[in-house]
Amino acid sequence: MSARAPSLPRPRAVPRSGKQLVAFWQVPKILVYLLGFIPAAWWFELGLADRLGADPMKALEHALGLWALRFLIASLAITPLRQLTGINLIRYRRALGLLTFYYVVLHLLTYLVLDQGLDLSAILADILKRLYITIGMAGFVILVPLAITSNNLAIRRLGAQAWHRLHRWVYLVAILAVLHFLLSVKVPIEPLFYGAVVALLLGYRLARSLLRDRGGKVPAKARN
């Protein structure tokens, strides 16, 4: 009697509206965090080497803020990417969101400590007089509770529905981030590009919500 080769378990398909979610190589989440901090380390290294140009503080602030916006957009793109292409990177959304917060904190600390030297009167005057700083601070205040509740314990305590309602404020944070960027530069080409991306993501979200409210067919697993 011939020996049979042991059969390997078949990968389980996850159907979704006639399509299967694409199984991507599973990168450990910790690696996402480590890779995410490389830009910050690089820019601080440039600063220590005195290679940030004539205004190093502004260059560092700009770079950290820009990376915060990039990570924010990446986190917002996770759900549309899954719904439109089947590419499922949902397990990395929290990491991208927290990286957004970490970069915003670094951006803010660079302004408060390195740029303003913790001069509270100068900082308060900036917040009151410069609209882009007022908008940036407002975005940070909204972002703080989102970062604090980016964990499973918060989901259990708040309940899934309340937690999702709270985290929809991230879209307002994205709008404020783009406005902050737009008003802080003289040449608006770069912030307009990122603003267009945010507008597309927000428009997609609103379109799906309207479709669902009107009784359109929206896959259950896409309602995130």
Segments and roles (model prediction):
Residues S2-N224:
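Membrane-embedded alpha-helical bundles that constitute the cytochrome b-like, heme-associated redox core
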